[in-house]
Structure formats: structure tokens, C-alpha cells
A protein has these predicted regions:
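Flexible inter-domain linker/hinge segments
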Residues: 94-147, 327-422
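Short helix-loop-beta junction
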Residues: 13-27, 78, 168-175
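Active-site cofactor/cluster-binding pocket
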Residues: 35-36, 48-51, 55-66, 142-154, ...
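Redox- and metal-dependent alpha/beta enzyme cores, enriched for Fe-S-associated oxidoreductases
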Residues: 2-23, 36-41
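C-terminal non-catalytic interaction/assembly regions of soluble proteins
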Residues: 19, 26-96
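Short, surface-exposed amphipathic charged segments that create phosphate/polyanion-binding patches used
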Residues: 43-47, 98-108, 284-288
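Extended, hydrophobic alpha-helical segments in both membrane/secreted and soluble proteins
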Residues: 41, 162, 420-422
């Protein structure tokens, strides 16, 4: 592979995995793009190279190839290097994630006797049919890396708490740390996803966490909406759900697919009612401190007493200017969160849970119903990145049917106002 930018770190991870399994693969990182020195580039290529895939993070409509691809082809021609097959691919357009599975797909394509000259990765392109088929990839992260994922609501403090958590782990242990944060366009009141990694080896994973050792859902509506939260958990991992439900009530809200996944993959399931606890302590809607404390207890990154003390020190530093009452409230929340969760015994019957038949009750103009069904509903379920290109046929110029916002009822509030006319 010849590439530049963050995909090089992903490729390195995959190369380490493949070479350990006897494959002969490699990577040339382009660090200085202009001037493009052809003799230096060709000198960096081993004599044994037979095939090259050049990855560009851009699209040149009307061109016979993207810029880096054209430079590589030209460099080989100018320097007289023959017998090398060169193909070009695009990745990362529209902020698409590029996980290891995409890099595995590129090397699989190169193994073919006649690889396609142009391709894309990271999206299912069933219109021009340029995308490479991807299969679930093995975990290529450094051994011992712990991966965590937190689903929060914009404004609930989840992102801030996770920034504090990663600082505590990085400052007070010998572990390497990494954090990425995803937001939707709504900011406050929208979905936030925090991706945390920490481990004893350097972390070269510039992509989102796909399968996590620990997953926390900080808003119960995400469970009823059947967000892909449960399938984020690795087999044997832990799932913490913040809700006001009892274990019996939780069973009513989990989908059949979620129940089967939890039971079949030995997921440790925990419930915590940080919503009522925060109100009781006086924190209002801010559940982040309670949930952060529960995370440190369950994740066992460091001794519990140390983690609690470091969280209290951070809270004191953050809220000292707001007065002793605010600091004390946060300290109470930290102490409460460390023990407020309960483990749920997963019934054996969940392994055979069956989904109730779905009924569509969408009514309206045919073009609006088609948009809602094919685009808006998957996006609302946080499955938008899995949509194929064909889902957008008919909307190429950016025009959408009017009146579609009426179908977006998010229902993320824990409480709703009651009007009192008196």
C-alpha cells in the first residue's frame, strides 16, 4: 500500500498482524507530497514488490485517477521500474471511518490475479460497484489494549467526564491512552459517542471502537430505539445501562436480537439508576459524575480507592470557583456511583428470544414515506453509515421531500413538562 495520513497507522496494525501470519505485505508512507521526488519514491520500494494499491482521500471527478495514484504511476514510468501492477482506491470521504477491515479488503484485492484498477473502501457502493467487499476483521490492536465506548446525550456531561477519565488514567498509571469523540449535528440534545482506549503498548488505532470491552448507555431511550449498542460489546465484555427500570422492566425494552446477543456472548449486564440518584443528590440532569465513578469500579483500570480520590481531586479543581456546596455534591455523586449499579442475571430463555412482527404505520406522500423508510429511519437508529449508495439515488442534487421533519420524533427526554392552567 502507498498512502499518506492517518490510514498509515491502521495499515501498520494490519501489516503487523498479516506478517505475523506469514503474509508478504508492506506500506510506503508519503510524508512530503510536493515536490514528489520520483527517484526517492522508487528507491523506497523493495525490489520484490509485485502489486501496489495507492490510497487517496479525495475524489477527482473526470480524471483517470486520483493525484497520488497518478504520481505513483508516473514515478514508476519515469524511473523505468517495470513489472509492477498499480491500482488506486479512495477512502475516508465524507468522514467515513476506515477500520482494519477496509485495509484487509485492500490486501485481499491485491492478492487476485487481476485486481480492479479503481475501488473504494468504507462504503457499500452498489451504484458504480467500485467498493471492495469487507468482512469482519480480527482485532489488530496491540495486545492488552482495553477498549470502551460510551453513548451519551449532548449536554449530559458524558464527553467531559470521559475526557477527565482518560486524563486520570494517563496521568496516574503507566498506560498509553487515546480518546475520540463523535457528535451528531444537534450538539446539545443529540447523540454523543465517546471512544476510549488504554493499554500497556503504544496505541496506533486512528479509527472508532467497533467491539469494546466495556460499553455504557447513559440514556435509556437508546435501548428502546434499538441503537446498535449491545452489539458493540465484545464476547465476555460488560454493558452498563443507565435507566429507571427494574431488571424485569428492562426485559420489556430490550429487542429480541439484543437479548440473544447478550445471552449467547456471555455479556455481563449491569443497571444503574443515575437519573434518580442525581436528582436526590441535587445534581439535576447531570449524571456524568455518577456514571464515571461506576465505570472506574467496573473497568478495574486502577484500584478503586485511588480512582475515587483522583476523581474527587478533579472535581475539586473543576468546581472550586462555584463554591463548596457544588464540590461536595460532586464528591457525594462519586461515592454513590461506585456502588449504585446492580448486576442482572441473564435468563437462559434470552438465547431463543423471538422478535414480534413489525408493523409499519408511516403515512403520507409516497416520496416522503420512501425517504423516511430508506434513509431517515436507519439514520435515526444510528445505522446511517451502513447505508449503501443506492439509498441516495434520486437525492443526488441535495433536494429532499418537504415535511420529513414531522417523522423525526426522537423521544430522548427522561421527563416531560405537564401544563398546569392554574
Amino acid at each position: 500500500i502507498v498512502a499518506m495520513g492517518s490510514i498509515c497507522d491502521v495499515a501498520e496494525e494490519v501489516i503487523d498482524y498479516l506478517t505475523a501470519h506469514g503474509e508478504k505485505v508492506g506500506l510506503v508512507k508519503v510524508r512530503l507530497y510536493r515536490p514528489f521526488v520520483t527517484e526517492k519514491f522508487v528507491a523506497a520500494l523493495p525490489e520484490t514488490v509485485k502489486k501496489i494499491a495507492v490510497l487517496d482521500r479525495t475524489k477527482e471527478p473526470g480524471s483517470i485517477g486520483e493525484p497520488l495514484y497518478m504520481d505513483v504511476v508516473n514515478a514508476l514510468s519515469v524511473e523505468g521500474r517495470e513489472g509492477v501492477t498499480v491500482i488506486g482506491g479512495r477512502y475516508g470521504l465524507g468522514s467515513k471511518d476506515t477500520p482494519p477491515s477496509s485495509v484487509f479488503a485492500v490486501y485481499s484485492e491485491l492478492e487476485k490475479d487481476a485486481p480492479r484498477r479503481q475501488f473504494t473502501i468504507g462504503i457499500v457502493d452498489d451504484v458504480t460497484n467500485l467498493s471492495l467487499p469487507e468482512v469482519p476483521a480480527p482485532n489488530t490492536a496491540a495486545p492488552g489494549t482495553i477498549e470502551c465506548k460510551f453513548w451519551g446525550l449532548g449536554g449530559d456531561g458524558t464527553v467531559g467526564a470521559n475526557k477527565n477519565s482518560i486524563k486520570i488514567i494517563g496521568d496516574h498509571t503507566d498506560k498509553y491512552v487515546q480518546a475520540y469523540f463523535q457528535y451528531d449535528s444537534k450538539k446539545t440534545g443529540g447523540v454523543t459517542i465517546s471512544h476510549l482506549r488504554f493499554g500497556d503498548s503504544p496505541i496506533r488505532s486512528p479509527y472508532y471502537v467497533n467491539k469494546a470491552d466495556f460499553v455504557a448507555c447513559h440514556n435509556p431511550s437508546y435501548i428502546t430505539k434499538d441503537f446498535p449498542i449491545v452489539r458493540d460489546v465484545k464476547p465476555g465484555g460488560a454493558l452498563l445501562i443507565n435507566c429507571q427500570w427494574t431488571p424485569e422492566e428492562l426485559e420489556e425494552h430490550l429487542s429480541a436480537a439484543a437479548k440473544r446477543y447478550i445471552a449467547e456472548n456471555d455479556i455481563k449486564l449491569y443497571l444503574i439508576n443515575a437519573i434518580d440518584l442525581a436528582i436526590e443528590i441535587g445534581m439535576g440532569k447531570r449524571t456524568n459524575t455518577i456514571l464515571q465513578s461506576a465505570f472506574f469500579t467496573l473497568a478495574k483500570v486502577m484500584p478503586q480507592e485511588e480512582a475515587i480520590q483522583y476523581m474527587k481531586d478533579a472535581a475539586t479543581k473543576s468546581y472550586a470557583k462555584k463554591g463548596a456546596d457544588i464540590v461536595d455534591m460532586n464528591h457525594k455523586a462519586i461515592d454513590a456511583g461506585a456502588t449504585a449499579f446492580v448486576q442482572v442475571d441473564v435468563p437462559e430463555a434470552w438465547k431463543t428470544a423471538e422478535a414480534a412482527p413489525k408493523t409499519s404505520d408511516i403515512d403520507g406522500r409516497p416520496e416522503t414515506v420512501a425517504l423516511v423508510t430508506n434513509v431517515m429511519e436507519p439514520v435515526a437508529r444510528m445505522d446511517g453509515d451502513s447505508l449503501p449508495v443506492s439509498a441516495f439515488v434520486g437525492y443526488e442534487d441535495g433536494q429532499f421531500p418537504l415535511g420529513a421533519s414531522a417523522y423525526e420524533k426522537r423521544g430522548v427526554a427522561v421527563s416531560v413538562p405537564e401544563w398546569n392552567p392554574d
